[in-house]
Amino acid sequence: MAKAIRRSCAKHLFAQCGSGFNLEQGAYIGNGKKFSVGDNVGLGKNFTYHCRIVTIENDLMMGENVLFLGGGHKHEHEHEDLSIPMIQQGGLPDTPLHIGSDVWIGSRAIILSGCKSIGAHSIIGAGAVVTKDVPDYAIVGGNPAKVIRMRK
């Protein structure tokens, strides 16, 4: 019953919500207006999404405690102006994230704002910290995530 309630809420809150959608307990998605999912998408327990336009195509599997983070603080200059507190040096704009079809994201993976695309048929290893785009058919892992091998 709880899954049906979460699914019903998502269909009303998300920009788009396909059939076969599953949202596990403890997920945080904010207002959902920037969040679109295709068919057969499963978001894992305690999934957290902040500040991004997210489009997920069909057939996504996700483990527990996955984070999609966007925006953030400027890091390209490593907060080099020491006369200004880091918190006052401003943040970065949100960047869209597109996730292709047939993707598996392992537990505790973190997708940061530097990643704008996770390619179709790819696998993100458990605990990976994804800072850059992931090509189609790639298996990535580590911190920062790197291509381990290609599935095809």
In which residue ranges do the predicted regions lie?
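Flexible, glycine/small-residue-enriched loop-and-beta-strand segment within the central core
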Residues: A27-V37, G42-I118, N143-P144, R151-K152
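Extended, small-residue-rich solenoid/repeat segments and analogous flexible loops
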Residues: M1-Y28
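C-terminal/domain-terminus segments
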Residues: I111-I139
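Secondary-structure boundary/capping signal
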Residues: C17-G18, A138, G142
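Conserved switch/coupling elements of ABC/ABC-like ATPase nucleotide-binding domains
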Residues: V129, P144-V147
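Short beta-strand->loop
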Residues: V134, M150-R151
